[in-house]
Structures are given as structure tokens and as C-alpha cells.
Amino acid sequence: MTNIRKSHPLIKIINHSFIDLPAPSNISAWWNFGSLLGVCLTLQILTGLFLAMHYTSDTMTAFSSVTHICRDVNYGWIIRYLHANGASMFFICLYMHVGRGMYYGSYTFSETWNIGIMLLFTVMATAFMGYVLPWGQMSFWGATVITNLLSAIPYIGTELVEWIWGGFSVDKATLTRFFGFHFILPFIISALAGVHLLFLHETGSNNPSGITSDSDKIPFHPYYTIKDILGLLVLVLTLMLLVLFSPDLLGDPDNYIPANPLNTPPHIKPEWYFLFAYAILRSIPNKLGGVLALVLSILVLAIIPILHTSKQRGMMFRPLSQCLFWLLVADLLTLTWIGGQPVEHPFITIGQLASILYFSTLLILMPISGIIENRLLKW
């Protein structure tokens, strides 16, 4: 009798994706983040569903409904904070996952990489819209400032902003449509993640050495299922420490003040995971230039495969490129810090220098280091 796992049309797909999948024998813990992102997405969809049962997307009651969830709903507080801090964990895993792709040259799988960039944009859009829903001060002003950036687009900018707002300012129509989009986008993300996996399994996983591993494969289960559980335990422990001991550590105190269109907060800033892009936006004095730099700060990932000049795939045996990679990481941390600071001296200058360094490292220094390392191979 044939094993049902290998014969059943539906279970067969799961079997080929998670059980009998041939995986390289030497992939490290950096390959954990894909499965952790799947766990984060599932957690966000489930907690979000329970929150949506009690939330009302109306400007008069949105803030009160979130308060009601925390005070009156059974375990509502833990659901709300799991959702809010789960988003932070999602982005930590996401940035680690992208960083691993850049370090080990996984961007050479162009379809998988491009779908990944689409996923990154979609997750960022979803997180932004979710931040608007509690209708606190930072929700309202964050929505106003970020949507207003579209007015920098020539000719159609102003009409586009008013079309998105559903009026002449961020109001009830905006909140309702943002809730609708925030609810549907995670399911689109799930579908895109399926396509991402489909393309990945066409080629097989990359590995730290960057060379083909066709001759040395092991089954995904039990080896990597067990290995992924370790990463999962670390993720759950970190998340629960955040949720149970300091749930507001990564949030903004201004969001505990109900939205007031007549009172602007002293420092309008997005959630911490967008601060690097926000710093790049603010570092350019021109509005359209800032918006373009903001979009390009993420879109630059799409041209990394074109700029790959090295004969080696990953950075495992390329010390010069490794130095530049960690310089880029330090630069992104600097930008994140700058994004949370007020717009004054010396933060403006530091932000501008960090922004220049970010783009020049990715577009100029890394391709040059690849060429230099190719020359060094001949010595």
C-alpha cells in the first residue's frame, strides 16, 4: 500500500514542500527566518482576526474600541499586544531574512528575490495601515504625513491624496478603507509567500558556501524541522518577554492620546521598523526628491542582482565585501536612530551622511569590491 503522504493529491504538495524536500546539509541558522516569518504571519492573521471581532473602524469609536479590547474583552490585552509586538518580531525576522539573502548571494534566484521584494513592500503597506487603526495622535498624524507624500507626484499628486483620503483630510472614510485594506492584505501576503516558496523549490535552497549542493542533500524532516523549532522557541520567548513585561517598549506614548486634528505632536515619527526609510526621506530638502529616495531605499534591492560583479556567489570567502556589508548594517542602525530624533543640528547632517553612505555602499562600493576580489583571486 502506498504511503498516503506520497499519494494523496493535497498532502503530496505539503510532503514535497516540508517533509521530503531535499535541503542542503550545511545551511545555518540564518536559513531559519523563512519559517519564522510564516509563524509570524500566522500569528498576525489569528490575533488580527480576534481583534477585528471587537474593533470598530469609525473615528468616533475606534480609540474607545481598542481601550475596550484591553479592558473588557477576555485576554484582549494579550491579543492586542501580541499583534502589536508580533509586527515588530515580523520586521526583525524580515530584515534578517533580507540581510541573509544579500550576504549569501541568494538574490541570484531572481524570481524568488523579486517576489520577496513585492512581499516586503506589501508587508510595509499593511503595517503602516495597521498603525493608523488605533486612532491615537501618532496614528492620525502618521497617516496624514505619509499619505501627503503622494502630493509630491507631479500633476496628479493632490487629486491622488484626496482620492486615498476619501475627502479633504484624513477622516472616517480613510480609517474605514485602511481597515478594509489592513484586513485583506495579509491574505494577499500569504498567497505571495506561496508563490515565493514555489519559485524557491524550483531551484532549491542556496547554502553558506554559495556552491551547488545537488550532490549533498538531506530531507527537510526531521533535520530542519527540529532545527527550526529552536528558532521558533527563541522567537516565542522574545515575543512573550516583550508582551508580558514591557508591551509598550517599541510603541509611541503619543498613541495613548486620542487623535486630535487641531493639535500636532512635537515629533511625528513612524514605528521603529520604518525609521531608517523615514530618516532617508527627511535627509533630502526637496519633497519629491525625498519621496523618490524613500521608495528607492527599498527598490534598490531589485538592482542588487544586476550589480553582482564577483565570481563568487556569497560573501563567505570575501573579506572586503564582508566589511562593506557590516558597514551597511551599522549605517542602517544609525539611520534608524536618526529617524527617531528631532530635525535639528547635528542630526540633519548625520542623517544626510548616513543616507549618502547607504546608497553609495550598495550601488558603488559593493560592485567595486567584487571586481577587486576577482583580481585578488588571480594573485
Curated annotation (Swiss-Prot):
Residues that, per the record, bind heme b b566: H97, H196
GO biological process: mitochondrial electron transport, ubiquinol to cytochrome c
Record GO cellular component, one term: mitochondrial inner membrane
Ligand binding (heme b b562): H83, H182
The keyword Membrane is assigned to this record: yes
Cofactor: heme b
Keywords of the record: Electron transport, Heme, Iron, Membrane, Metal-binding, Mitochondrion, Mitochondrion inner membrane, Respiratory chain, Transmembrane, Transmembrane helix, Transport, Ubiquinone
Annotated residues for binding of a ubiquinone: H201
Self-association state and partner proteins as the record states: The cytochrome bc1 complex contains 11 subunits: 3 respiratory subunits (MT-CYB, CYC1 and UQCRFS1), 2 core proteins (UQCRC1 and UQCRC2) and 6 low-molecular weight proteins (UQCRH/QCR6, UQCRB/QCR7, UQCRQ/QCR8, UQCR10/QCR9, UQCR11/QCR10 and a cleavage product of UQCRFS1). This cytochrome bc1 complex then forms a dimer.
Designated name of the protein: Cytochrome b
Organism: Felis catus (Cat)
Organism ancestry: Eukaryota, Metazoa, Chordata, Craniata, Vertebrata
